Curated annotation (Swiss-Prot):
EC category: transferase
Protein name: 3-ketoacyl-CoA thiolase
Naturally occurring in which organism (per UniProt): Shigella flexneri
Xref: NCBIfam families: AcCoA-C-Actrans, FadI, PRK08963.1
EC numbers, comma separated: 2.3.1.16
GO cellular component: cytosol
The family this protein is said to belong to: Belongs to the thiolase-like superfamily. Thiolase family.
GO biological process: fatty acid beta-oxidation
PROSITE patterns in UniProt: THIOLASE_1, THIOLASE_2, THIOLASE_3
Key words, A-Z: Acyltransferase, Cytoplasm, Fatty acid metabolism, Lipid degradation, Lipid metabolism, Transferase
Active site: 99 (acyl-thioester intermediate), 392 (proton acceptor), 422 (proton acceptor)
Length: 436
């Protein structure tokens, strides 16, 4: 076991997560069609503060993230402060770590708490795949800059004459890695082939995810942590996530064609997480500040770890890399965990990470560790379903996982929970949570 790194303030306070809330998650171009990311963020933070009844002046910092950037609101965190009636003096800044963005937001607030610069803060993230920053071609952008500097109409017309019809076409946001040109689904296909993940295994995991998420909603387990969203024209509120397939069968999954490798692939739209809109936020405090306010925390942040690997081959192995480090810093082993929640970007990616967490060879030859991190107990794993079912608003997923895991730990009488995710750029994130 390596060095244990306790997450405590200088006064010995633990980092408490006192509450968490999210919007329902909606598939792209459905319930949140036309609602920009900043409005989703304001929606969830405003409701979180109203429900908590914590005075606005208690919150000293807000760290918030988005992955699909809004050019008109680059510092989304500050816009949320100004748009929710929070104290205008509240410090606010934005972060982005791809699919691990709200993990990063939580870590940043925790670090401010440990440093003693604040005693309470909000962390979260939001994304909209329905309101996208549509760009222009490089040639049109180049010409527009020159046109802005041109002094005469003839100069402007001469510049515009260089353009062709194709240069005027809108350019949607890239869905591929900037450095490699590979789409996330291409990487998932790589991983399926590298680790021998079959189509049947992927479909079975996706089916399991939807079944468990549907059951969680049916049992009322998510009501406390998901707000009702009222959206224009205010005729039909959104109460639940709208991606979950409650009545699907494995036979339904088998009907879909591969989405990326059309000839030989196994990754489909059904065994991948869909493009999604939504927002999530959590309130963190020092343990003593929570006691002063008479608040009972959902739980505590025990440790966290971020890792990075190469992006050319099998880059979505973040959980296999970050989990052993987070467990080491928490002073725990895999067998001591009560719950394990892993982000399901793709079923292939999820199954590959599960395989490597239990691999002695991977531990020795790749991680340089003496033993495997540990086998993933299916009875502890994604017990309420995962991102394939709920959806994945990129910056919101981490905080969803944290809130969901802490509530489930409390229902089980406490214990330790691991939340972990892969992210674009070969990044990985893991956090160990504790509930009493």
């Amino acid at each position: 076991m390596g060095q244990v790194l306790p997450l405590v303030t200088r006064q010995g306070d633990r980092i408490a997560i006192v509450s968490g809330l999210r919007t329902p998650f909606a598939r792209q171009a459905t319930a949140f069609h036309g609602i920009p990311t900043v409005d989703l963020g304001k929606m969830v933070v405003g409701e979180l503060l109203a429900r908590s009844e914590i005075p606005a002046e208690v919150i000293e910092q807000l760290v918030f993230g988005q992955v699909v950037q809004m050019p008109e609101a680059p510092n989304i965190a500050r816009e949320i402060v100004l748009g929710t009636g929070m104290n205008v003096h509240t410090d606010a800044y934005s972060v982005s770590r791809a699919c691990a963005t709200s993990f990063q937001a939580v870590a940043n607030v925790a670090e401010s708490l440990m440093a003693g610069t604040i005693r309470a803060g909000i962390a979260g993230g939001a994304d909209s795949s329905s309101v996208l920053p549509i760009g222009v071609s490089k040639k049109l952008a180049y010409v527009l800059v020159d046109v802005n500097k041109a002094r005469t109409m003839s100069q402007r017309l001469k510049l515009f004459s260089r353009l062709r019809l194709r240069d005027l076409m809108p350019v949607p946001p890239a869905v591929a890695e900037y450095s490699t040109g590979l789409r996330m689904g291409d990487t998932a296909e790589q991983m399926a082939k590298t680790y021998g993940i079959t189509r049947e295994q992927q479909d079975a995991l996706a089916h399991r995810s939807h079944q468990r998420a549907a059951q969680a909603w049916s049992d009322g387990k998510l009501k406390e942590e998901v707000m009702t969203a009222f959206i224009p024209p205010y005729k039909q509120p959104l109460v639940e996530d709208n991606n979950i397939r409650g009545n699907s069968s494995l036979a339904d999954y088998a009907k879909l064609r591969p989405a990326f490798d059309r000839k030989h692939g196994t990754v489909t739209a059904a065994n991948s997480t869909p493009l999604t809109d939504g927002a999530t936020a959590v309130i963190l405090m020092t343990e003593s500040r929570a006691k002063e306010l008479g608040l009972v925390p959902l739980g505590y942040l025990r440790s966290y770890a971020f890792t990075a690997i190469d992006v050319w081959q099998d880059m979505l192995l973040g959980p296999a890399w970050s989990t052993p480090l987070a467990l080491e810093r928490a002073g725990l082993t895999m067998s001591e965990l009560t719950l394990i929640d892993m982000h399901e970007a793709f079923a292939a990616q999820t199954l590959a990470n599960i395989q490597l967490l239990g691999s002695e060879r991977f531990a020795r030859e790749v991680l340089g560790r003496a033993h495997a991190t540990g086998e993933v107990d299916d009875s502890k794993f994604n017990v309420l379903g995962g991102s394939i079912a709920y959806g994945h608003p990129f910056a919101a997923t981490g905080a969803r996982m944290i809130t969901q895991t802490l509530h489930e730990l409390r229902r089980r009488g406490g214990g330790f929970g691991l939340v972990t995710a892969c992210a674009a750029g070969g990044l990985g994130a893991a956090m160990v949570l504790e509930a009493e």
